[in-house]
Amino acid sequence: MKKIIAIVITCLTLSAILIAGLTYKQTVLASQQSDPTVANQSAKPKHHYLLVMGHGAGDPGAHGNGTTEAHFLRAKFLPKLRKYAKEVKNSRVTFYNPKHDIVRDTLVFHKGSYKINKKTTVIMFHLDAGGGAYAHGGHVIIHRPTPIKRDRRLAHVIKKYVGLNPAYHGYSYRTNLRNCNVLRRRGIDYSLVEMGFITNKHDFKKINQHLDQIAKNDIEAITHETIK
């Protein structure tokens, strides 16, 4: 009789342990499903876009219409880009230090583009300058001989608000830009956006009139996300 009682007690104990183990496992699984930090661990990492304002750090860039390229990009355009960059959900958008000139950092100090993670996409903004019949409109300097979808979206923004430069029809592929060459040799994806001519009063008027929309549309074009 004592043996039977002992066997029954052992069976009941094992059953209790088994039930407790299953209950604990179900509790852990339920907490993981409801905990966003656990879910985020398996989520796809956000792609990083680094946005760069051209020139700066003592290099004014192009002059025109009472301002300089470096000042206009940093004082007027950068704040609007920052505003809309905060709205994207599936990408990480950061900005190169506006107190620096990425070209100088790269070519003089061997930093800048040499220190950028190879998985980062770099988008540079500039304003063109010059005279003559073709000195108006913008275009995108691309990192491959043919434009990718992002380049086409960026060119569409230029066409919509400023107009395309008739010499390039939206794009140019150049191998004589030393900073861009560093990015290309390192296998880093990039686009350089020439927004329009700072020396052309019609271009500059359009850019100023639509600056907020240009910034919003550029962020959407870069990240391929829709901002409400």
Model-derived features: positions:
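Sec-dependent N-terminal signal peptides of Gram-positive bacterial secreted proteins and lipoproteins
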Residues: 1-26
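Active-site histidine-acidic residue metal-binding/catalytic motifs
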Residues: 33-110, 136
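Structural recognition of the beta-strand scaffold that forms the well-ordered cores
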Residues: 49-53, 92-97, 120-125, 139-142, ...
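Solvent-exposed loop/turn segments at secondary-structure junctions
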Residues: 56-59, 99-103, 127-132, 145-148, ...
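A short, glycine/acidic-enriched catalytic loop
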Residues: 59-68, 129-161
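Long, well-ordered alpha-helical scaffolding segments within enzyme catalytic domains
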Residues: 77-82, 147-165, 204-228
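Mature extracellular/periplasmic domains of secretome proteins
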Residues: 105-119, 180-186
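Active-site-adjacent mobile loop/cap segments within catalytic or ligand-binding domains
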Residues: 124-128, 172-228
